[in-house]
Design a protein with these regions (language model features):
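Mature N-terminal segment immediately following signal peptide/propeptide cleavage
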Residues: 63-83
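Extracellular glycoside hydrolase catalytic/binding regions
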Residues: 59-62, 86, 90-106, 191-223, ...
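Short acidic, Pro/Gly- and aromatic-enriched capping/linker segments at domain boundaries
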Residues: 52-68
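Sec-dependent signal peptide recognition
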Residues: 5-12
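Bacterial Sec-dependent N-terminal signal peptides
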Residues: 16-53
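Feature marks short, surface-exposed loop/turn motifs that line or immediately flank catalytic pockets
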Residues: 85-88, 127-134, 184-186, 230, ...
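Structural recognition of the beta-strand scaffold that forms the well-ordered cores
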Residues: 76-84, 122-128, 175-179, 222-226, ...
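Aromatic-lined substrate-binding rim segments of carbohydrate-active enzymes
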Residues: 96-185, 200-204, 251-266
Length: 316
């Protein structure tokens, strides 16, 4: 998978709560009452389950403030790192098939080697690779598609592979940005994504599972990137595209539903894709993603913009 740099853009909402005191008169005579123990009354709007950090957290909490990530001291934190995927094909066939321990051993050794060489990374983009969650008995429909997704296999290897690998990264001081299995539909038999389609249902299921996981929920070292490029959506006019007002209008609705699903479970930082190869975001200025601790997962490929050329190639 290609490396990218994440750029943050988010609105924070501050809520001011006003309270009032009653002006009821005091009765002339009060009967003494026995002392009552202090009992905390239940609050129907209590969100205590989502308050406080996961006890498995080992990294300082970060939050999205304007266009920056900041720590609890208000200092700007820049993340720089790499991406890692877990198919043997992309890892020199270093292990056989579904050998979990072989996969862990190899990828941990890669991390150790990178750090030993002196690279100062503090985050990794972790692909929850569909190699593990696909049902191999089903026919493949497209490259890294969602059609063969097995919830049983996903839960199994989330526990056995992805969470242990994430814990290893965090033990090395690296934040983990998880992305879902595979890529958005972008080739036959699809023209792209659309509101209410099977891919949106797939993402809702994946993130509902991940955001409720006891070792990931509210873990200060874990963030969620909702989907992976390329992103082409059916707009309000019925056409599929990656630009224009109508496409952004539906894109906001598409990803807002997933944001809301995650927020019902956890407070982890969320990274929202844009259109095209996650390079188009202007429409979000009008059709805003609502919520806190949300940024944009902007993908930028320097080579495409001519950084590898001896002369200006006028790309971009």
């Amino acid at each position: 998978m290609k490396n990218m740099k994440n750029t943050v853009s988010i609105l924070l909402f501050l809520f001011v709560f006003l309270s009032a005191c009653s002006d009821d008169s005091i009765p002339e005579k009060l009967k003494p009452e026995p002392p009552q123990p202090d009992v905390e009354e239940p609050n129907p709007d209590d969100d205590s389950e989502n308050c406080g950090n996961n006890q498995n957290s080992v990294l300082p909490a970060l939050s999205v403030v304007g266009r920056y990530l900041k720590n609890e001291k208000g200092e700007i934190i820049n993340l720089h790192g790499f991406t890692q995927t877990y198919s043997p094909f992309f890892n020199n066939n270093a292990w056989n098939n579904y050998d979990v321990q072989g996969c862990l051993n190899y990828n941990k050794s890669m991390v150790d080697g990178i750090l030993a060489a002196g690279w100062k990374f503090n985050f990794v983009r972790m692909h929850l690779d569909p190699y593990w969650s696909d049902d191999p008995a089903m026919q493949s429909v497209r490259y890294e598609g969602h059609e063969r997704f097995s919830e049983f296999r996903f839960r199994k290897y989330l526990d056995e592979l992805f969470v242990p690998m994430a814990e290893y990264f965090m033990s090395k001081g690296m934040y983990v940005v998880m992305r879902p299995p595979g890529v958005c539909p972008n080739e036959a038999p699809y023209q792209g994504i659309e509101l209410g389609d099977s891919y949106q249902q797939f993402l809702l299921k994946v993130w509902n599972i991940v955001s409720q996981h006891p070792k990931l929920k509210n873990n200060t070292g874990v963030m969620f990137e909702l989907a992976n490029e390329p992103v082409k959506i059916k707009g309000t006019d019925g056409t599929y595209g990656s630009t224009g007002d109508g496409h952004f209008q539906n894109l906001q609705l598409y990803f807002q539903a997933i944001v809301d699903k995650i927020r019902a479970n956890s407070r982890n930082i969320i990274w929202v894709p844009g259109l095209s190869y996650q390079s188009s975001y202007a429409g979000y200025a009008k059709y805003r993603i609502q919520g806190e601790n949300i940024g944009f997962a902007v993908h930028c490929y320097p080579g495409w913009y001519g950084s590898d050329a001896e002369e200006d190639v006028a790309k971009g």
